[in-house]
Amino acid sequence: MPGEERERFLAGLHVGVLGVADGDGRAPLLVPVWYRYEPGGDVIVQTGRETVKARLLRAAGRFSLCVQDENPPYRYVSVEGPVTAVDDPVDPAERDAIAHRYLDPEEARAYLKSTAGQLADDITFRMRPQRWRTANFAAFAAEFSEADRIDRDG
């Protein structure tokens, strides 16, 4: 994917899969996350201060995030980079923005109200994408579709 397309795709509404090294010699920890990204900026994720994810993010100092389109033609963007900042405590405006990104306004208000008590226990990690990996299978899907048509009509 060209640069602008990949940035727009990452900024789109997806549940991301965050990956972070596990220093215990195990496979990386992979977890679904809500995130926020604006083209040219940092990837922003929030988690509980005492979670395994937070501990591993602090230790590794970097993480990856992968987002995908689950509908044909399939596409994905994966970014990896260093943690550029840890906001502790969470900025309530940032938490609000992430909730409103994933939920309609009424659901977001209810979610934020019901989880207000955990605000003091959450932290924000910011990552500046350094490596990008992308794929857009639209061309493959078009070729496959054309080959299938030729086989049927052939």
Q: What positions do the PLM features span?
A:
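Charged, gly/pro-rich active-site loop segments
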Residues: V77-G154
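Hydrophobic alpha-helical segments typical of transmembrane helices
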Residues: P2-E5, K53, E94
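Short beta-strand segments
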Residues: L13-R49, R55-L57, F63-V67, Y76-V79
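Hydrophobic small-molecule pocket/channel-lining residues, especially in calycin-type beta-barrels
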Residues: G3, C66, E70-Y74, S114-Q118
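A generic secondary-structure signal marking the coil-to-beta-strand transition
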Residues: R6, H14, G41, R75, ...
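Short, surface-exposed beta-strand-loop junctions and turns on beta-sheet-rich folds
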Residues: T51-K53, P72, A141-A142
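Short secondary-structure boundary/capping segments
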Residues: E7, Y35, R55, T115-G117
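Extreme N-terminal tail/first-helix region
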Residues: M1-V15, E143-G154
